Amino acid sequence: MSNKLWEKNFEVNKEIERFTVGRDREMDMYLAKYDVLGSMAHITMLESIGLLEKDELEKLLAELRHIYQLCEDGKFSIEKDVEDVHSEVELMLTRKLGDMGKKIHSGRSRNDQVLVDLKLFTRHELMEVVDNVKALFDELIQKSDQYKDVLMPGYTHLQIAMPSSFGLWFGAYAEGLADDMLYLQAAWRMTNRNPLGSAAGYGSSFPLNRQMTTDLLGFDSMDYNVVYAQMGRGKMERNVAFAMATVAGTLAKMAFDACMFNCQNFQFVKLPKECTTGSSIMPHKKNPDVFELIRAKSNKLQSLPQQIMMIMNNLPVGYFRDLQIIKEVFLPAFDELNDCLRMAAYIINKMEVNDHILDNPMYDPMFSVEEVNRLAAAGMPFRDAYKKVGLEIEAGEFVANKNIHHTHEGSIGNLCNDKIQALMEQSMAEFSFDKVRNAEKKLLDI
């Protein structure tokens, strides 16, 4: 027996069904508990406009809370002959409560149902991404403060350039994450808007109370225009993917630096041996596989916006099955990004730095700019000072003065980490996480 919500008086060819269902059941497992939350808000609204009796609502809510708990406990599954999570939840309600379970779809389409599922899922995952970005940020700031006076070479073109410090290096990636948080804020604002009530993209003749479901689910506002609510499918995922890719870009660059600085030719940083891997043939090897995999996974994540754009590239207004494929690249991406963020925070915490790098005379030429500046400050024209020091270097006569004195904002001697922390705290304060958590707890009666 088939359990399709749209079934009429004919059967679909089995090969067509296999191809069109694809990985929907697998992907919908990501959305299961959010489908339940959306249904709880929807039926509460239906009761308020007279489409459900109060006792029906209470029974349906109780059963939906039970299904939600099954999802939380890992005991929920989508049966083989059931198309998707929406069908499975409705089927479970109908089996338990009879015709009452068939009433929950009034004023709703699977189109706006999956839209709200995706918004609720993405909202939850963004909360975790933000928390993990903040945790990594805190580790980087701590390391920056700890090693603020330890000098290291700065590079341009991979050539020794000017003095830098571990305070600057760790702090640079911390500020990068503070900037990335602005993209996550934009992603959150777009995500935290309610599409429920747009039905198949053209609204409903039922007198739906969309503001009520918006409040029940803790959304900041709604996607007002019902056509745009459907057009937002794919656009939301793409813009969230851009935010994720921005964070991934910061991770990838940091991982490259760490791999390079860890190698024997640099020896700027050291990883505990328990955080490295070995070789099957070379007994001396201690490889920074963690950073290499963070780099690769982060580079992969940076392709996500382009994948989504190409899937939805030439779609006109309205729903198309193409949009289902976005789930396959979008939904699993959060696990990958969060895993990279957690591992980066862990490994940064364990990282040790070499505080005697500049004892090696090969780094002396990078103090040439400091000498040029001293001569210029003493009155020599800058170009003359530049030429004088350059000739000394070429003649092997340059003697490095390593007593550097930088005082301006953001320099070796004035990292401004407190300002960077203030930027991050300001960003964190603008997320409405507590509102969301409280709304969901109230809906679940916990």
What role is predicted for each listed range?
Residues 119-126, 130-131, 145, 153, ...:
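Charged, flexible cofactor/metal-binding loops and thiol motifs
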Residues 60-61, 217, 273-275, 362, ...:
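A general structural motif at alpha-helix termini
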Residues 60, 77, 150, 157, ...:
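Flexible domain-boundary/linker segments
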Residues 1-203, 208-214, 221, 277-278, ...:
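A helix-coil-helix interface module used to build multimeric assemblies
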Residues 44-52, 168, 238-246, 371-378:
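Short, well-ordered beta-strand elements within core beta-sheets of diverse protein domains
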Residues 42, 63, 67-70, 92, ...:
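Generic, well-ordered alpha-helical scaffold segments in large soluble proteins
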Residues 1-38, 99-100, 267, 282-446:
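Glycine-rich cofactor/substrate-binding loops
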